[in-house]
């Protein structure tokens, strides 16, 4: 008998800099708890919370700023398994099912990774599309490419 896998409902933000559309750069941040892991901000959806509400809350918690404009939403939930090395950190879940949003930082937005007592990220940067997939952690690359390519195809990027 095989156990059914358990996936954590989650939101993720593809963040464009406030310079978009003049300059197309993506926000990525370096996690504090996983060596060399760069990724987009993301986090769980609390019970009774909409994905959009979770997006704003998670941005505030993880980057100290939710002063963004939502440009688009990926039409599907994307499910993936955690790599074996990360599974203990997120017990009892085997992976995540994520709703992705494309957002642009507003001009007056101020990122503050130290806004909360236990920071999720230790540093961040903005990268161009062709640099993005070299920078982010290996197990997120396929999903990120799928999501971003969708937003490009839809004319949102």
Curated annotation (Swiss-Prot):
Domain Nudix hydrolase as annotated: residue spans: 6-149
Residue span of motif Nudix box: 43-64
Domain of life: Bacteria
NCBIfam families named in the record: PRK00714.1-3, PRK00714.1-5
EC number: 3.6.1.-
Name recorded for this polypeptide: RNA pyrophosphohydrolase
Gene Ontology molecular function: any one: guanosine-3',5'-bis(diphosphate) 3'-diphosphatase activity
Gene3D superfamilies given in the database record: Nucleoside Triphosphate Pyrophosphohydrolase
Gene: rppH
Names of required cofactors: a divalent metal cation
Family recorded in the similarity comment: Belongs to the Nudix hydrolase family. RppH subfamily.
Family matches, as PANTHER family: NUDIX HYDROLASE 26, CHLOROPLASTIC (PTHR11839:SF22), UDP/ADP-SUGAR PYROPHOSPHATASE (PTHR11839)
Entry keyword set: Hydrolase
Entries under InterPro entries matching the protein: Nudix_hydrolase, NUDIX_hydrolase-like_dom_sf, NUDIX_hydrolase_CS, NUDIX_hydrolase_dom, RppH
Function: Accelerates the degradation of transcripts by removing pyrophosphate from the 5'-end of triphosphorylated RNA, leading to a more labile monophosphorylated state that can stimulate subsequent ribonuclease cleavage.
Pfam families recorded: NUDIX
UniProt-listed GO biological process terms: nucleoside phosphate metabolic process; ribose phosphate metabolic process
Taxonomic placement: Bacteria, Pseudomonadati, Campylobacterota, Epsilonproteobacteria, Campylobacterales
